[in-house]
């Protein structure tokens, strides 16, 4: 056993040689790239639901139950008194929640308007606890906004800050009688636009990370007033006395049945969001697993390049009488230093990447949930990235241990040359792994993570054979150049002494491009499917009229159907149909209910029906009591076509299943019925949108202008053509896929950095060999061109192999996304993505390594043959 001082002495002695120090730094860089990629991708997959969980926790506080209205019209607030009168209930507090937009001088923002009872300030969660009774009295006719939202709409800082109001309460109240102290803004709820004031902004000191949530707060009475919901609430939160839970739950269940409400735990929104975000989390998790594999292999391949140098260190220690234990100690200390440095650097780089890349929120879920933009970094995420980095360092450093166990030591080419049995094993293993991947693709695509692992294993096992084929092709091609530089490059590529390092470089390129092509290609297929969905759902009519704002892209905000009467008499319109829709909680899912007019051209687009006869399903939907349901929902309810089920709408109604569909781009799923059946089940004739078909010969612009004039300048309704609405859908879906896009981008960036680092390390190791070759009189320019040719062949070989397997990975991931998430994909092969990835990674890495290549050929010639 060696002491720590002796180990440090050996380590410092090794680092005195500049070549060794540079190799160690490049190995640190290679592992750091892998750690950064793994950390940033894991942050992406864990951040999505953090804001909703935090908001739910801070809002409900110690409440145990909630009575939740099933429709946007809410329920009479009389239910609050009935709930409070139940034996065992300590408190029953009303809450009014509505989709809204706040409009300021610089723009608008979508928010979840929360009208809270003043008593929430004392017994609710931290979100409302910083308001005391005096503050709530002061802001009876105002709203509160998180500071980032107020700044975004140009409302600026209020004249009275929430953090200072507590100290100035009575003075501010007195001064408010003498003149206005708040900033005027506008609030749009449905088609209704009202003027209000920004009474306070919520700072991070008040509500912590929730300052990034899309919420607006107001007293419940004021929220009822501005929202046209006088006497109505959407939720009732209940606090139970100790030991009375069973009694209270039974009483609340009877009350819920009477009023047609949902009885759920107080924090049930977090459960609903978990179900809503599961498909996105699954797809992001799948992509993150691929990224993790890619990142780990980046790190491992970076360490492979240092194996020859460590083999020489082992040989030197053995000659000086070092025991096996001493050698292992030195190697493990080396691995620990590299691993720790790489993990620290990787976490720092990953933190920067995740901050810069993951700053936007997935807007498609913010239509039904107050999703924030904050990042959530957990200890398991850090531990996973650090563990993978340390593992790569230890495996890479300890790889030479096989030489320690050999007696005698094997040197040079003998150590580099693989036995014939190992070659046959690689060929058989690659073929078997490829067969397993194919079976997973055909029979079990939801096991795509396993399939991706076996596909990468097949690629790495078969890579030496494919690499030899590409080098043989280069050999035939270079004969036409008659250039010394290509001859030198070919000799290096075929040299058995450098084969392991050459294969490590090619493998790094293959892994890099594989990850980029597979992830980007699958994401492109998903985006194409969502684009088709946007076209099919929106091009059923000429014009759409609905409450303005991106938050109403799915047309789920109600407004009076009487608006249609204003438009039916316009000369340029052929028909005006009432479209209805909203979100409805079905079990643990917040599903999207779509209810087009019965006479709509297409009640269910052909591309959305996955099981069933299109003609029969359309005919049934035009009748009474039929519905098309997403496959995931139908499987949960154990439904088959033709069977009946009760829809838990405000007025529970029986429907029969006409067919099964995709999720329509809404992760929890969709239910399609006609607008008349919707009005019956919801007990409301309110519209969510108007479908307008123009008369023959009327241009879109002319018809749109007529409708806008008829609605009037103060209307909160927007008039869009089918094309404009389609573009809005596509924009929102791209935002929803931003995490996947960011993960794909990170993989590509990491690929370039990893390839550049590995190539630079390889070139630096060649300095002694270049110095020995220069004795033959070769010029710097010739040697630099030879290095560039060699690097180009290595890069193109590895990247081309990765692109080939990446296209297969794209098909595997695409089928997995369809099966697991229910998204409407357009599955195809994207050769352009593969070619682009090969070109970007190869050109960028080659441009980067050109500099160290030029520096390497400046070494002085020597007669000493390298070891």
Give the location of each predicted region.
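Small-residue-rich transmembrane alpha-helices
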Residues: 300-303, 337-368, 380-406, 432-444, ...
């Amino acid at each position: 056993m060696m002491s720590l001082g002796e180990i440090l002495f050996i380590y410092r002695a090794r680092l005195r040689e500049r070549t060794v120090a540079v190799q160690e730094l490049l190995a640190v860089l290679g592992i750091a790239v892998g750690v950064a990629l793994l950390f940033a991708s894991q942050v992406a997959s864990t951040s999505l639901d953090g804001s909703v969980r935090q908001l739910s926790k801070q809002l409900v506080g110690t409440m145990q139950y909630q009575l939740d209205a099933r429709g946007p019209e809410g329920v009479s607030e009389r239910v609050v008194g009935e709930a409070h009168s139940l034996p065992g209930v300590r408190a029953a507090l009303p809450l009014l929640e509505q989709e809204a937009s706040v409009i300021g001088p610089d723009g608008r923002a979508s928010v979840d308007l929360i009208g809270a009872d003043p008593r929430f300030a004392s017994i609710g969660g931290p979100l409302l606890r910083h308001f005391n009774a005096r503050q709530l009295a002061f802001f009876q006719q105002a709203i509160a906004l998180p500071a980032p939202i107020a700044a975004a709409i140009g409302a600026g800082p209020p004249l009275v800050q929430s953090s200072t109001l507590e100290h100035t309460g009575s003075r501010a109240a007195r001064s408010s009688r003498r003149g206005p102290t708040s900033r005027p803004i506008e609030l749009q709820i449905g088609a209704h636009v009202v003027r209000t004031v920004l009474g306070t902004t919520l700072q991070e000191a008040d509500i912590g990370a929730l300052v990034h949530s899309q919420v607006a707060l107001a007293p419940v009475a004021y929220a009822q007033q501005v929202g046209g919901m006088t006497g109505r609430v959407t939720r009732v939160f209940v606090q139970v006395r100790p030991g009375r839970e069973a009694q209270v739950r039974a009483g609340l269940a009877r009350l819920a049945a009477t009023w047609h409400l949902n009885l759920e735990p107080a924090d049930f929104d977090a459960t609903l969001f978990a179900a809503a975000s599961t498909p996105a989390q699954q797809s992001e998790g799948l992509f993150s697993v691929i990224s993790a594999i890619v990142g780990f292999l980046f790190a491992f391949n970076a360490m492979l390049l240092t194996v020859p140098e460590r083999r020489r260190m082992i040989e030197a220690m053995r000659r000086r009488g070092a025991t096996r234990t001493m050698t292992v100690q030195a190697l493990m200390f080396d691995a620990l230093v590299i691993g720790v440095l790489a993990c620290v650097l990787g976490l720092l780089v990953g933190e920067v990447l995740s901050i810069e890349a993951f700053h936007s929120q997935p807007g498609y879920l913010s239509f039904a949930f107050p999703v924030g933009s904050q990042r959530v970094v957990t200890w398991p995420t850090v531990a996973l990235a650090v563990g993978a980095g340390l593992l790569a360092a230890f495996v890479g450093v300890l790889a030479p241990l096989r030489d320690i166990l050999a007696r005698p030591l094997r040197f040079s080419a003998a150590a580099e040359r693989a036995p014939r049995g190992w070659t046959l094993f690689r060929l058989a293993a690659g073929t078997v792994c490829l067969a397993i991947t194919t079976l997973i693709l055909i029979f079990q695509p939801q096991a795509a993570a396993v399939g991706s692992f076996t596909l990468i294993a097949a690629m790495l096992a078969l890579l030496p054979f494919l690499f030899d084929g590409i080098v043989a092709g280069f050999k035939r091609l270079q004969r036409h150049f008659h250039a010394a530089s290509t001859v030198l490059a070919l000799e290096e590529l075929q040299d058995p002494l450098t084969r392991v390092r050459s294969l490590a470089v090619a493998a790094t390129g293959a892994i890099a491009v594989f990850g980029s092509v597979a992830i980007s290609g699958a994401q492109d297929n998903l985006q194409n499917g969502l684009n088709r969905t946007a076209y099919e759902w929106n091009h059923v009519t000429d014009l759409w009229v609905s409450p303005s704002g991106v938050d109403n892209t799915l047309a789920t905000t109600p407004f009076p159907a009487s608006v249609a009467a204003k438009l039916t008499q316009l000369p340029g319109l052929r028909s005006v149909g009432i479209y209805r829709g909203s979100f409805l909680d079905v079990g643990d899912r917040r599903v999207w209910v779509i209810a087009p007019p019965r006479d709509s051209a297409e009640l269910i687009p052909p591309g959305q029906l996955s099981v069933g006869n299109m003609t029969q399903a359309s005919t049934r939907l035009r009748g009474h009591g039929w519905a098309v349901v997403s496959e995931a929902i139908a499987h949960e309810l154990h439904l088959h076509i033709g069977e009946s089920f009760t829809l838990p709408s405000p007025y529970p109604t029986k429907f029969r299943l006409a067919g099964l569909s995709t999720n329509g781009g809404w992760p929890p799923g969709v239910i399609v019925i006609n607008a008349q059946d919707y009005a019956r089940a919801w007990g409301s004739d309110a519209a969510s949108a108007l479908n307008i078909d123009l008369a023959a010969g009327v241009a879109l612009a002319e018809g749109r202008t007529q409708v806008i004039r008829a609605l009037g300048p103060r209307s909160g309704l927007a008039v869009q053509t089918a094309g404009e609405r389609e573009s809005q859908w596509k924009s929102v879906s791209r935002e929803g896929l931003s995490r996947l896009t960011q993960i794909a981008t990170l993989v590509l960036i990491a690929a370039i950095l990893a390839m550049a680092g590995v190539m630079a390390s390889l070139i630096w190791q060649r300095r002694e060999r270049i110095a020995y070759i220069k004795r033959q009189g070769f010029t710097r320019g010739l040697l630099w061109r030879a290095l560039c040719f060699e690097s180009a062949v290595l890069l193109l070989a590895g990247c081309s192999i990765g692109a080939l397997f990446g296209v297969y990975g794209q098909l595997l991931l695409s089928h997995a996304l369809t099966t697991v998430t229910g998204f409407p994909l357009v599955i195809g092969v994207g050769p352009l993505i593969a070619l682009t990835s090969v070109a970007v990674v190869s050109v960028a890495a080659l441009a980067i390594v050109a500099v160290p290549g030029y520096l390497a050929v400046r070494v002085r010639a020597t007669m000493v043959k390298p070891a």
